[in-house]
């Protein structure tokens, strides 16, 4: 090995380390230069191993960052409506200088019929819609502007703003790719049926406060599903709509629970006694008075006096209340002995099971006759092996004593309570057998009104009088003397004349063809007697004339007016309208094309599909609701989104119109504090007077609104006297 070997190796090692250090130094300097001063051109010469930097804006990542930054700047500069949280194209300026978008202004004035300011609740007759977002309405002479809508009280700054606003108020087809605008609801429904084979929901059309193009078209199956279960399982599930409530008696759907309860109050009967009794379902409805009578006879106590039967609803929840009513209202029907015995009340109590109470009652000494004491002693001896306390044995002895007293007094017939089980309450009178015989004699001495009318009538035969019977068709209550057979009432003669007018009109339309007239009479009578459906009857009648579209509208209207059943009238008119839609020949005349309609749907599709926008509009249109706070500069309205979260969608009621979202408006409502669930623990109820009914739905079950709420118990912790208490609810 030569002596110069190690030195050469050291030199080579030093050279390699210098090259390495120079490379790292070049990299650091290049990085620092790129941070301090960006390269703006590709013409810069770079070393072979240097990093080539692209100019700003040419790299795809840099392009994305630049576009995002520009969008954020545009979003910050864009005006946001404080009601719907959407971008403002045209501003609606009120005389109080509060502002909103022109879409919300049209919703409030055209759909909700309100001219109040959303923020200060001041009513203004005239507002201004303009493109200028910073304009002061007091600097503009509204009377000189030619573009005005006097019906809505809106003044437009230019013609284009007026056209954009009027486009929202037209009868536009809701289909996404359709640009047809119709003249009215009939033409729009006809167009949807013929062109798209879809239908509108009539309940939503009548009650829903949205623009025409914001409605939803359904197929036949989809419309049935919409009424029954709502938007579950479809694209509109975010609205939380659970279907239109249905009246089980009439088999008819209604828009919401308020409409259903209104219908039940007007068309059906309600048991007011069940509303007062604790533990029973409140708001329990019955189809008619006959079914309510059967409920009274089965579960309650009815006064059988004639005047009370004629008055109706003279029913009591307990037998003691019935006896008190008889003593107060009908004392002449009792003898002195019966009055004295009726005022005696044998108490009956419901005791807790043995061992429920910790206190021991003193054993009562027996002062009854020998046979009673014997039975009591036997009962005590039978209970001695049960290891009961002295108080429990005394309690059972007392119950045995009360039962024996009732058995003894039952022979004299003046008990106020039937010892039979309470599950099968008697519906018979509380009188004794002897009293019932006396009552029969008095009915014969004082016959009912039906018997007197039958005796005075010369044409009607005499009918034996029966005891008063509680029925909606009872002669003792609803008897109306019928006119003599030889004379006709003016109402009957007028109705017969109207029938003859319909026959004469059809004879002219059919050229007095007897076969066609017979077919017409057969179709009408079959439909009236529930033998033929409305669609088949309409189809038969339309085949009898040459031009049914022009000739039969008046005929069907007259037939509908003559039908006694309003439901049948509605079915006939709906079948006639459906026939006209299905058999429309010239469907090209329905509606006109509008090129701006598709642009309107694309621009407003997000707002129209979200229930939160309708929630805010509903809240803003409320007359008695709190006014919205005016927007301040510290609030970043661009961050407010109109898309509901999953949690809010589950709690949103049908189609999102009954509850308003308060997250964007910093407001609270009573829906933020759901009601507590009903207690399931067994309680002792003392019926002293009337009790306030608990709200449930029409059919006695838990209402849908409470089932959709969060059932978690909400408590507020408070400190009192150094202890922490939980307040579950407040009264008053």
UniProtKB/Swiss-Prot annotation:
A molecular function annotated in GO for this UniProt entry is: zinc ion binding
Q: Which UniProt keywords apply?
A: Cytoplasm, LIM domain, Metal-binding, Phosphoprotein, Transferase, Zinc, Zinc-finger
Q: What InterPro entries does this protein's entry cite? A: RING-HC_ZNF598/Hel2, Znf-C2H2_ZNF598/Hel2, ZNF598/Hel2, Znf_C2H2_type, Znf_RING, Znf_RING/FYVE/PHD, Znf_RING_CS
What the entry lists under SUPFAM superfamilies is as follows: RING/U-box (SSF57850)
Q: Which residues form the LIM zinc-binding domain?
A: 245-315
Q: Where is this region: Disordered?
A: 1-48, 345-380, 411-501, 623-732
Family the UniProt entry places it in: Belongs to the ZNF598/HEL2 family.
What is the protein's name according to its record?
E3 ubiquitin-protein ligase hel2
């Amino acid at each position: 090995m030569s002596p110069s070997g190690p030195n050469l190796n050291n030199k080579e090692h030093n050279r390699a380390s210098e090259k390495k250090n120079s490379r790292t130094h070049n990299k650091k300097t290049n990085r620092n230069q790129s941070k301090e001063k960006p390269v703006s051109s590709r013409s810069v010469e770079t070393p072979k191993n240097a990093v080539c930097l692209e100019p700003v804006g040419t790299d795809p990542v840099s392009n994305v960052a630049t576009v995002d930054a520009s969008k954020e700047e545009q979003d910050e500069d864009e005006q946001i409506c404080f009601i719907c949280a959407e971008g403002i194209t045209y501003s609606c300026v009120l005389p109080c200088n509060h502002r909103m978008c022109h879409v919300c202004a049209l919703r409030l004035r055209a759909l909700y019929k309100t001219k109040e300011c959303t923020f200060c609740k001041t009513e203004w007759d005239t507002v201004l819609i303009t493109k200028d977002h910073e304009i002061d309405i007091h600097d503009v002479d509204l009377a000189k502007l030619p573009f005005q809508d006097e019906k809505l009280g809106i003044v437009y700054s230019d013609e284009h703003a007026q056209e954009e606003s009027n486009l929202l108020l037209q009868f536009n087809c809701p289909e996404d790719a359709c640009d047809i605008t119709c003249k009215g609801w009939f033409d729009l429904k006809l167009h949807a049926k013929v062109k798209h084979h879809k239908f509108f929901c009539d309940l939503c059309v009548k009650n829903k406060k949205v623009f025409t193009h914001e409605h939803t078209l359904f197929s036949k199956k989809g419309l049935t599903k919409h009424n029954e279960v709502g938007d579950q399982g479809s694209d509109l599930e975010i609205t939380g709509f659970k279907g239109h409530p249905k009246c089980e008696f009439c088999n008819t759907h209604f828009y919401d629970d308020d409409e259903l309860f209104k219908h039940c109050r007007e068309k059906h009967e309600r048991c007011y006694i069940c509303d007062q009794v604790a533990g029973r379902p409140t708001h329990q409805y019955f189809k008619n008075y006959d079914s309510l009578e059967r409920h009274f006879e089965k579960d309650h106590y009815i006064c059988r006096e004639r005047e009370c039967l004629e008055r109706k609803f003279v029913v009591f929840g307990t037998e003691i209340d019935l006896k008190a009513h008889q003593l107060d209202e009908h004392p002449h029907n009792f003898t002195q002995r019966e009055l004295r015995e009726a005022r005696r009340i044998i108490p009956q109590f419901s005791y807790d099971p043995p061992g429920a109470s910790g206190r021991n009652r003193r054993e009562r000494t027996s002062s009854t006759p020998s046979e009673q004491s014997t039975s009591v002693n036997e009962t005590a001896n039978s209970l001695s092996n049960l290891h009961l306390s002295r108080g429990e044995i005394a309690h059972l002895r007392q119950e045995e004593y009360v039962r024996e007293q009732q058995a003894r007094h039952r022979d004299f017939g003046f008990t106020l309570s039937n010892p039979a089980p309470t599950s099968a309450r008697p519906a018979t009178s509380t009188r004794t057998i002897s009293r019932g015989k006396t009552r029969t004699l008095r009915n014969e001495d004082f016959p009912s009104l039906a018997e007197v009318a039958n005796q005075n009538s010369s044409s009607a035969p005499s009918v034996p009088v029966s005891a008063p019977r509680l029925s909606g068709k009872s002669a003792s209550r609803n008897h109306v003397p019928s006119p003599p057979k030889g004379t006709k009432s003016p109402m009957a003669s007028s109705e017969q004349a109207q029938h003859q007018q319909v026959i004469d009109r059809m004879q002219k339309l059919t050229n007095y063809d007897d076969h066609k007239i017979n077919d017409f009479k057969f179709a009408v009578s079959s439909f009236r007697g529930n033998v033929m459906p409305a669609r088949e009857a309409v189809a038969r009648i339309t085949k009898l004339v040459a031009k049914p579209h022009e000739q039969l509208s008046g005929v069907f209207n007259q037939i509908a007016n003559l039908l006694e059943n309003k439901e049948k009238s509605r079915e006939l008119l709906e079948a006639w309208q459906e026939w006209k839609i299905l058999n429309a020949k010239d469907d090209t005349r329905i509606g006109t094309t509008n090129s701006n309609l598709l642009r309107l749907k694309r621009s407003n599709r997000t707002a129209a599909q979200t229930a939160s926008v309708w929630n805010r509009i509903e809240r803003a249109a409320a007359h008695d609701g709190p006014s919205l706070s005016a927007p301040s500069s510290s609030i970043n309205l661009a961050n407010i989104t109109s898309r509901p979260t999953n949690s809010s969608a589950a709690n949103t009621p049908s189609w999102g119109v009954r509850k308003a979202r308060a997250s964007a408006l910093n407001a609270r409502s009573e829906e933020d504090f759901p009601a507590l669930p009903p207690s399931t623990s067994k309680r002792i109820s003392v019926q002293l007077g009337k009790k306030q009914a608990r709200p449930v739905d029409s059919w006695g079950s838990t209402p849908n609104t409470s089932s959709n709420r969060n059932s978690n118990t909400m408590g507020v912790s408070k400190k009192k006297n150094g202890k922490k208490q939980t307040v579950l609810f407040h009264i008053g």
